[in-house]
């Protein structure tokens, strides 16, 4: 959305909002507070920065304590698993929750938690891809903050039609995020990716 001078419109997600939505999931689940860790995406990537910033501002003033945060060198599942293994060694049972910047990274975190026998950790990740939906269905991931590409495409077509017809339209269109849980995963369209 920052490079608006290069396009007629933007239809996509607000990664800051994704971080804030993840923070709200933790606050809602742990009203009395909790200690959590964050496994970030590719260090320096726009989505990583905004998801982290949204998350940190989202938990500010709450009873959620961020024990540690570490970014990956890339959006690599094995990197997320290695970081989580290090967090487990360092913090052990103090970890009540994990915020991961992407669902496929959560796959590695789930494996690390399973190997450590830590079955009651509340795991929230972003993307809403097949891995996230499947992990939520299986109960190994608590929440997936879903990006609806269907809704992005629909809004993009509406903007393109308005542009071609000479009508006015919003230049920046942030698409609402889906909070995917075990309770609602079956009611949402299964992702193509």
Which residues make up each language-model segment?
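A residue-level marker of the well-folded mature domains of exported/periplasmic proteins
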Residues: 1-193
């Amino acid at each position: 959305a920052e490079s608006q001078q290069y396009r007629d419109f933007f239809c996509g997600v607000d990664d800051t909002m994704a971080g804030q939505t993840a923070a709200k999931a933790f606050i809602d689940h742990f009203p009395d507070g909790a200690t959590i860790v964050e496994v970030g995406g590719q260090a320096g990537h726009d989505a990583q920065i905004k998801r982290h910033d949204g998350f940190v501002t989202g938990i500010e003033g709450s009873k959620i304590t961020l024990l540690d945060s570490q970014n990956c060198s890339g959006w690599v599942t094995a990197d997320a698993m290695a970081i989580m293994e290090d967090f487990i060694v360092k913090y052990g049972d103090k970890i009540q929750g994990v915020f991961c910047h992407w669902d496929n990274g959560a796959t590695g975190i789930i494996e690390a938690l399973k190997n450590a026998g830590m079955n009651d950790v509340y795991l929230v990740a972003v993307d809403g891809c097949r891995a996230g939906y499947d992990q939520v269905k299986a109960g190994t991931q608590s929440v997936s903050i879903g990006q609806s590409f269907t809704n992005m495409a629909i809004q993009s077509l509406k903007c393109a039609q308005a542009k071609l017809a000479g009508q006015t339209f919003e230049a920046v269109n942030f698409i609402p995020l889906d909070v995917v849980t075990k309770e609602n995963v079956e009611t949402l369209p299964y992702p193509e990716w």
